[in-house]
């Protein structure tokens, strides 16, 4: 099987039951198919925790105004986050590589509120957003940078946004995934591994699959033909869902105006 970051691709088999300790449930929310995977034991291909995937129309045709997708995405993400406290949004990836630029492009549209007011505004959650870059450009690993930021800011949670890989071509640019297990790339030993055990705070991950292996074991990858639009529109869509999840007292339209 090709490498995949999507939990439901590993455990959703139409003709067999999931492994012991794994529960898979699928539901419809309007025009969005939501699949929840809950892993209750260690020793499987993914860490124990909750994973939510949302199958949506082509991301390249959506944006921050598509409430039919943003509202269910925000609700699923909100359920994985602590109900209160500051949140640090980390845009993981290389902004100079299109397929890897989802994280940095997303944080550009996050509604940042931390440090904006001397006195906290009632109903507005403190949020900071950073795109730390890649170690080749900074000389520091993602773990070092994330750890330093967490120690300084002391957030209630770290929310990491990253490009994902899928094993199914039809899901590229058509799926959102959220999880409360941290950033756990499919490739073993990958440097982008962030979790609560390493950082001391809950780590929630969000992403969209933007590439897949050309074949199992190959170093070649396949990306959607409309990759530029997937990244641009996907970043806007994810940012809108994140903003709505973190600031439920504000409407999608209000958040769009505040981040425009």
Name these PLM-found stretches.
Residues 105-139:
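Long, charge-dense
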Residues 76, 98-115, 175-184:
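A glycine- and small-aliphatic-rich helix-loop capping segment at beta-alpha/alpha-beta transitions
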Residues 130-131, 144, 160-260:
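A structural signal for small-residue-enriched, beta-sheet-centric alpha/beta enzyme cores
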Residues 126-158, 163:
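Catalytic-core regions of hydrolytic enzymes
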Residues 92-102, 136, 163-167:
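Gly/Ser/Thr-rich loops at beta-strand to alpha-helix junctions
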């Amino acid at each position: 099987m090709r490498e995949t970051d999507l939990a439901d691709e590993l455990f959703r088999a139409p003709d067999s039951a999931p492994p012991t300790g794994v529960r898979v449930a699928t539901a419809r929310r309007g025009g969005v198919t939501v699949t929840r995977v809950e892993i209750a034991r260690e020793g499987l291909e993914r860490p124990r925790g909750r994973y939510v995937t949302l199958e949506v129309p082509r991301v390249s045709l959506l944006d921050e105004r598509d409430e039919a997708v943003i509202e269910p995405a925000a609700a699923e993400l909100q359920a994985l986050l602590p109900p209160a406290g500051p949140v640090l949004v980390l845009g993981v990836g290389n902004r100079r590589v299109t397929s890897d630029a989802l994280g940095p492009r997303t944080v550009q549209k996050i509604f940042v509120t931390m440090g904006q007011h001397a006195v906290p505004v009632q109903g507005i959650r403190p949020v900071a957003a950073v795109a730390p870059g890649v170690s080749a450009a900074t000389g520091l690993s993602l773990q070092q940078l994330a750890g330093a930021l967490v120690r300084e800011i002391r957030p209630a949670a770290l929310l990491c946004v990253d490009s994902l890989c899928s094993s199914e071509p039809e899901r590229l640019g058509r799926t959102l995934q959220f999880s409360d297990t941290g950033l756990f790339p499919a490739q073993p030993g990958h440097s982008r591994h962030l979790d609560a055990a390493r950082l001391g705070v809950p780590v929630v991950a969000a992403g969209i699959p933007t590439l897949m292996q050309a074949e199992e074991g190959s170093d070649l990858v396949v990306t959607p033909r409309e990759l530029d639009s997937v990244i641009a529109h996907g970043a806007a869509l994810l940012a809108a869902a994140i903003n709505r999840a973190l600031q439920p007292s504000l409407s999608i339209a209000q958040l769009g105006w505040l981040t425009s």
